[in-house]
């Protein structure tokens, strides 16, 4: 249905009225051209008749010198012929309006998923509300993947279903709209608007192209390692991705002629967005202060095994596998999902010319730059000042609104920001209540029983636990929620099965970041980069799964050897 609607929308419409027909050339020099009122008269035209004869009665087709035979007196002329009514013009048929609603097949797939799970008997130990919410949640996930409607609409329908079935109260269903993370992501899009509108984004982008732009790969690596250097100082991956790198990457894409919606996404933007997202997940796993939920892992580790993970412990253990991942992942994506622009030796020269043409910074560029520095400074030192990331972002946006660098109408026009806020908050709410209703605890306990009863070595048992912990993240829209729900249980089981406790804790801590690369909602940077609309959802999930395998191989393989060398096991 979606493809039919698309074809109806994009195909030109033709009117059958005579005005749309091309004028016909005269058949001879003596005959005038004929403008026909309908397709029917065109088909019945005789080439031997002029236009005047074509519309005359048969008796008038005789030559003028011959009188028509009449029984009446010559003094009584024949009555004039009855006028022949001209054929009525054929009116243009009414245009068929394209279908504006949902794509039927994806919608049915989403509904059917929920209905099937809903009517499966509730397992022992699971409450009915938890099972109903699981059915609605998975139905919503299928809808988000197949997209019968935009993501925000699908998520809103999921919340509506949970309230309608009394699975959640209204306040519970919409509780996550008060969560800071969705708002931080939305605010990042407003910052990006100011970044691009003022031209500051273009200026910085051209500087990057001037320094590293002779190849797309060099440009990508310059962004990757810049983000990794900022990671330990900015403890919010949403803030790093949305407030700093999304505006910069979008400006780079536009500067290189890669835009959304005109078929040029694959020139540079698709590869660059996916690369920056996947490497933001890696850099978040490399430092204790690189992601907001990492200190939670450290706290739960201390509560479970009585030993804390220090900042240097974390950084030393993550350095080698993290560095290898930062090098391998962009290169792998460059091979399997390559940009169309690979080499541009003239790009640095052209970028320099653009910078010369732009001249000195404008007033609005200066305001934008100072505001960005203020916001980043609060992200770095806000913990000591009692200012969290979203409050810092609101303060920065307030400065932009007061100075007129960004207007509120422009913020309202950022439909992607509001759409992302809607679907991300909806998923956070549903995933959070799956945990509150005890479904995640039930799942963890059953995994523990099954793996513990297999009689495997601690290495094999830990490998099974790692895979289950990692890929269960498809059911979470927050790293913190996943850690809070499953970290303690899996760490306890791994330790009981013989895994060195500190090794198990630090590996699960790293995986709590890396698993965010699976989906477009699994970590704070995911909806930021996905919301730029350069990469279609199937590719986002597909390459997310591929990179997850590569990361597991690197972190458990290369990382395992490194951890052996530094004495973790």
Swiss-Prot record:
Processing after translation: The N-terminus is blocked.
Coiled-coil features, chain-numbered ranges: none
Extent of the signal sequence: none
UniProt tissue specificity: Expressed in leaves.
Composition skew (Low complexity), residue ranges: 23-74
Region Disordered, residue ranges: 23-93
Subunit architecture: Monomer.
Chief site of localization: plastid
GO annotation, biological process: alpha-ketoglutarate transport; malate transport
Similarity section: Belongs to the SLC13A/DASS transporter (TC 2.A.47) family. DIT1 subfamily.
Any single GO CC term annotated in Swiss-Prot or TrEMBL for this entry: chloroplast envelope
Alphabetized UniProt keyword annotations: Chloroplast, Membrane, Plastid, Plastid inner membrane, Transit peptide, Transmembrane, Transmembrane helix, Transport
Known role: 2-oxoglutarate/malate translocator that transports carbon skeletons into chloroplasts for net glutamate synthesis. This translocator exchanges malate for internal succinate, fumarate and 2-oxoglutarate but not for aspartate and glutamate. Involved with DIT2 in primary ammonia assimilation and in the re-assimilation of ammonia generated by the photorespiratory pathway. Imports 2-oxoglutarate into plastids as precursor for ammonia assimilation. 2-oxoglutarate is converted to glutamate, the end product of ammonia assimilation, which is exported to the cytosol by DIT2.
Induction comment: Circadian regulation with a peak in the middle of the light period.
Pfam families in UniProt: Na_sulph_symp
Protein name stated in the entry: Dicarboxylate transporter 1, chloroplastic
Keyword Transport: yes
Membrane topology note: Multi-pass membrane protein
Species, as recorded: Spinacia oleracea (Spinach)
Subcellular location: Plastid, Chloroplast inner membrane
Transit peptide: 1-93
Gene name as annotated: DIT1
Lineage of producing organism: Eukaryota, Viridiplantae, Streptophyta, Embryophyta, Tracheophyta
Record bears the keyword Phosphoprotein: no
